[in-house]
């Protein structure tokens, strides 16, 4: 994948949901012990992080549905904490870019409502923290991820 989901978590959720069928996730489920804990860090105002966090969490809590995974009960009942990063930087305006600074707050607000109903509201996490900063400072180049974000 050259770029993320450029502010479209609905697309990201379809793609990232395939992770539950991967060998890596099955290996993780098999290696998970009863005393293990999980801590997930994600962003909330774009597409990839906003989609990835709920999907990963859902797949962990639905671990009994993973075939050939021995420790899926431990995984399903694991204590999970998370840190979600709110908008914290400024980007240059570029009308041709799919990423627009003016959309950050609206996308964050929509994601927060979704998280309230589908993550904290149903006790999928034991603790959820938010961190962010005033993002009005110097503007970074507007890059959807295939060039500048890899520096």
Segments the model singles out, each with a brief description of its role:
Residues 1-151:
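Tubulin/FtsZ superfamily GTPase core signature
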